[in-house]
Amino acid sequence: TCDDFDFFMEKPDVVFHLAALARIQPSFDEPTETFDTNTVGTQRVLEWARKDNTPVIYAGSSSSHGDKYCNPYTFTKWQGEELMKLYNKVWDLPTTICRFYNVYGPQQLTEGKYCTVVGIFERQYKNGEPLTITWEGEQRRDFTHIDDIVDGLVKCAEGITFSRENGESTGHITGQLFELGTGHNYSINEVADAFGDDYPREYIDRRPGEMLETLCVDTLAKDVLGWKPKKDLIEFIKKYYVE
């Protein structure tokens, strides 16, 4: 309920709605929890923000580009985006969607069902275990460093607050969907190669709901926000794990 947000001591300038049950595979086993958190939870955030017309910046998912009905996670993240659009159109609530592309970086999860492929490889490499690769490893992903993601979110918030403080329209940011991807992708085999061409790997069956490719081709974040990703996945792996 909206009372869940009473912990705020004062009205925030912007709400970053980043909370979600992430990852595709766990959503098959926990569909109710996934819908409650990702869809119902998002509507509650929006309803609370609507009371004071507080801008909401939402963490969307690049998986929304694929088949929205192939797994509960993708469907609920897409529903979250649609809720953002609904509240913006019907109640004129300032909402912005930032789609994330396979986020990685320091202190990422390396254990449990919510860790990413980079986190899994990190754990396996440090433990001297073979890297487990699903399918044939030729599925491709656009990977974005957490620092670049944060930079994109901050640029959104700064644009909104600056425009509001100066009595200007926020329409160039609110109501928009920004893709926070690098515009370059790597196959999972190429990611594994970064840990060493000769490092052992093990191929396992394809998982349900797995997409063949993600790649950011939209330039709106660059054109409107001046956002430009600075980090590269392969360089990150070699710097922090291999060298």
Where do the language-model regions lie?
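Gly/Ser/Thr-rich beta-alpha loop segments that engage phosphate groups in nucleotides
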Residues: 43, 62, 68, 107, ...
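N-terminal Rossmann-like NAD(P)+-binding domain of SDR-like oxidoreductases, especially those catalyzing
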Residues: 1-103, 153, 157, 227, ...
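NAD(P)-dependent short-chain dehydrogenase/reductase
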Residues: 72-74, 78, 82-141, 146-157, ...
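Conserved alpha-helical elements of sugar-nucleotide-dependent glycosyltransferases
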Residues: 41, 117, 187
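Short secondary-structure boundary/capping segments
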Residues: 7, 25, 122-123, 169-170
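C-terminal substrate-binding subdomain of Rossmann-fold SDR/epimerase-dehydratase oxidoreductases
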Residues: 126-243
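Short glycine-/acidic-enriched loop or helix-start segments at secondary-structure transitions
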Residues: 26-27, 67-69, 107, 143, ...
